[in-house]
Amino acid sequence: MGNLLKVLTREIENYPHFFLDFENAQPTEGEREIWNQISAVLQDSESILADLQAYKGAGPEIRDAIQNPNDIQLQEKAWNAVCPLVVRLKRFYEFSIRLEKALQSLLESLTCPPYTPTQHLEREQALAKEFAEILHFTLRFDELKMRNPAIQNDFSYYRRTISRNRINNMHLDIENEVNNEMANRMSLFYAEATPMLKTLSNATMHFVSENKTLPIENTTDCLSTMTSVCKVMLETPEYRSRFTSEETLMFCMRVMVGVIILYDHVHPVGAFCKTSKIDMKGCIKVLKEQAPDSVEGLLNALRFTTKHLNDESTSKQIRAMLQ
């Protein structure tokens, strides 16, 4: 134990307060089976991010091919540039499916009776850490995807070329790897501004609808509790001093924002209304106290990828804080 400590001296506004050791939490025997399953998925997350970060696209080749439609050599050059990129995009998409299943397994563990979500997070520190790692990955992936228009340009060109060749009764080898059904699913995935967040949101909603005997509050309380965990660690010098690196601080901020966004998509009235169990003002305040260049992307994520920020029920003060 000891990785997740309940804060007995700071019961402020009835929000749960914890310290979660994001750096060292280790699985207990009871957690190990699920932990191993999730770990097998997460071990590929860094290579996915590195591959996405290095993604340059086939813009020049596509442009030359479009401008010179009768030049067969340029058509082939563009096609040969795009095909390996589409295989990479398929890998990213398939990872999202694995992540979806991993999240549902975690939610099952962190919300099941007889324990409350708060008790689960106290007892199952290592699973809580993996949940945080999924959220951290999701925000990083979506940040990179949003900054890279080449992804959709490449895939659109690929689909147009496939359609044109199908009309001419040509079958291309890549169709064995990315068939029409797979291409349709990938197209829907990459059409989203934040595809990984959409995947997590859908996975959470699916989990709620599949577990009708489990109150939705068990799931949303798990999310709001995780937000409080992050917020209290960020605003309390005693806990911040336990982080061994700035990287962990950034991790904690990104997880807090990821959980808020997920909560806002899953909860019927969202994260910003007065009845929300998330202290939105406190969370935004904590972010704004950091170096501006390190949190601008996170503040933008709250501005542009949440669902209920612009609802009438959102207080003017919260909206003003995010302007």
From Swiss-Prot:
It is a lipid-anchor. Interacts with RAC1 (GTP-bound form preferentially). The lineage of its organism: Eukaryota, Metazoa, Chordata, Craniata, Vertebrata. It is found in: Membrane. This is CYFIP-related Rac1 interactor A. Signal peptide: none annotated. GO terms for cellular component: membrane. Belongs to the CYRI family. It holds the Pfam family CYRIA-B_Rac1-bd. Its main location: membrane. The keyword Magnesium does not apply. The keyword Lyase does not apply. The gene is CYRIA. Transmembrane segments: none annotated. May negatively regulate RAC1 signaling and RAC1-driven cytoskeletal remodeling. May regulate chemotaxis, cell migration and epithelial polarization by controlling the polarity, plasticity, duration and extent of protrusions. It comes from the Eukaryota. It comes from Homo sapiens (Human).
